[in-house]
Structure formats: C-alpha cells, structure tokens
From Swiss-Prot:
Quaternary organization: Belongs to the TFIID complex together with the TBP-associated factors (TAFs). Binds DNA as monomer.
Keywords: DNA-binding, Nucleus, Repeat, Transcription
Organism: Triticum aestivum
Alphabetized Pfam families for the sequence: TBP
Protein name: TATA-box-binding protein 2
A GO cellular-component term linked to this record: nucleus
Amino acid sequence: MAEAAALEGSEPVDLTKHPSGIIPTLQNIVSTVNLDCKLDLKAIALQARNAEYNPKRFAAVIMRIREPKTTALIFASGKMVCTGAKSEQQSKLAARKYARIIQKLGFPAKFKDFKIQNIVASCDVKFPIRLEGLAYSHGAFSSYEPELFPGLIYRMRQPKIVLLIFVSGKIVLTGAKVREETYSAFENIYPVLTEFRKVQQ
C-alpha cells in the first residue's frame, strides 16, 4: 500500500497501529456547524455566485467552493452541513470559509458546535473474497443480496461501523466519527477477509 503511505506523508506504515499494513484512505468527511443566526436563503442565493437555491426541491442553499473542494447545505435556521472534504482539518477549514462567506453577506454568523458526523474511507486488500462464505459464517452482522447490490454489507458493532465488502477485495467503511474507528474496524475485519480469501484456480 505505497499509495496510502505516500498520502499520509510518505512515512512507512506504523504496523503497531496498522498490523495489516493497509491504511484506509479517507474519501469524504461530513461535518455540521451552527452559524447561530437566522438566514435569508433567497438573499444568499442572489448575492453569492457559488450558490443555488430551489426551495421547491430542497429547503437549503447549496454552496460550493473549490479549495478545499466541498459542498455546503445551508439552512434558514443557521444550521450548515459540509460534505466532500478528504480530511477532518479540510472539513473544518471549508466550513469556516462558508461561514465567512455568509458573514460577508451581512449575517452575524458564528461558528458553534462544529462536529464531524461521518467519515467515509476505502481501501483494497488486493485479493478476491468469498462473500457467500463470509455472509454465511457472519450472518448476524452481514447482509448479502447480490441481485440487489454487488457488495456484502457488514454492520460491525464495535466500533459501530458499516463496511461494504466487494468480491474484488475493495472495501468501503462508513459511519465513523473519528478516523481511528475506521482504522480499528478495518483491522478487526482484515483477519476475517483473509479467512475468506478466494483461492484462484
């Protein structure tokens, strides 16, 4: 997993934290913040060039910035959701930028209760997996209906993370509030994945 190491700043993988030698890559961070003031969404949409507002479709202004590349949903209550950042710091930086845009439009926006709500990460174990066998022996945690969705959905209890496991060995992890939960969920599942490794004929 040289790519993961390169992304994390090119130091070698710390095997005490990541015994599998694989570090899941963060793909999307969802965060929320309270701007703590009522907002006139129509006025915001008219004044901000990176904003769209279609109240018949959705009761929020959708705003986008390029750096960090993110999308915000801004509600009249002053609540805001920020999605698309690739790290916690980037998510907070983006949320601050949106808050600043709202301030510049003349609203007394604050920055209260910033919170990471969901971290989505992915990785590749680089070997195929027997999903039927895994689903059968871990029935309490797994749902696998290949006609509906090609991946096995594994609901881990501790940490409370949902994993999508694909035959190819690609894994998506979602539901974490801190990245360590993502890492420990992956380390928990890794021995199970190796147990159900498909033997190539």
